[in-house]
Regions:
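A short alpha-helical cap/connector motif
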Residues: 1-141, 148-169, 173-222
Length: 222
């Protein structure tokens, strides 16, 4: 893998070797509950966030002392557990997913570690219908792991939902190496590229792209 610097030159010499990347990805041990949730995801056809991404989500939630978090794409609860691990003890997670079976798995994962039901709202439905009903500037962190075709719309809604100083994080930001490949021009890839550019070029956001998991784009709202 090579990286493009501000000067337009690539910095391939700084790219980690596969063994180094794997070491970093697994550096933080995964809790048993998260490992169990990850295992339950496979039969449901869910691709959960990587270990490195999960550890980063915990770090981000702790860094902003998150009390109110929105998650787009519940999955089997792996990312939700990671967010809870960093949130304040009174924090509430609002998680949206189109698949009730996914949310049932996530609910089981949350309850398995003693998270009370009043700390999570699992909303079954289309995120583009749910998000507009949530309050402006009321959330500390928005995590996007939904349909890549809707990433630009998620970003627009996420920015609206964030308080000043809040964070938005987009998983699958490298999309299996497709984003960096100029030969990949399918609709899904172009949609994610558009979302990345929207975040990068937004005047109200400070942005970084982290090479953890399948890529995690993180931005703070000024």
């Amino acid at each position: 893998m090579s990286f493009v610097t501000a000067s337009g030159k690539t910095s391939a010499k700084h790219a980690p070797k596969p063994a180094t990347w794997a070491y970093a990805e697994d550096f933080v041990a995964e809790p048993e509950a998260a490992a169990a949730a990850r295992e339950s995801a496979a039969p449901l056809g869910i691709t959960s966030v990587g270990r490195g991404s999960a550890a980063t989500l915990t770090f981000l939630a702790r860094a902003v002392q998150a009390r109110a978090v929105v998650e787009i794409g519940t999955g089997a609860g792996v990312s939700g557990l990671a967010l809870f691990a960093g949130m304040r003890p009174d924090g509430i997670l609002t998680s949206v997913d189109t698949e009730p079976a996914h949310q049932q798995a996530a609910r089981k994962a949350f309850l398995s570690v003693g998270i009370p039901t009043q700390r999570f709202r699992l909303i079954s439905g289309d995120a583009l219908h749910v998000l507009p009903r949530l309050s402006d500037g009321a959330y500390d962190l928005v995590f996007v792991d939904g349909d890549p075709m809707e990433y630009p719309e998620y970003v627009e809604q996420g920015i609206r939902l964030l308080r000043h100083g809040g964070l938005i994080a987009l998983d699958n930001a490298l999309l299996g190496d497709r984003i960096a490949d100029p030969g990949q021009n399918d609709e899904e890839t172009e949609s994610v590229r558009a979302a990345l550019e929207l975040v990068r070029d937004h005047d109200d956001l400070v942005t970084t792209l982290l090479p953890v998991g399948d890529g995690l784009l993180v931005a703070a709202k000024r």
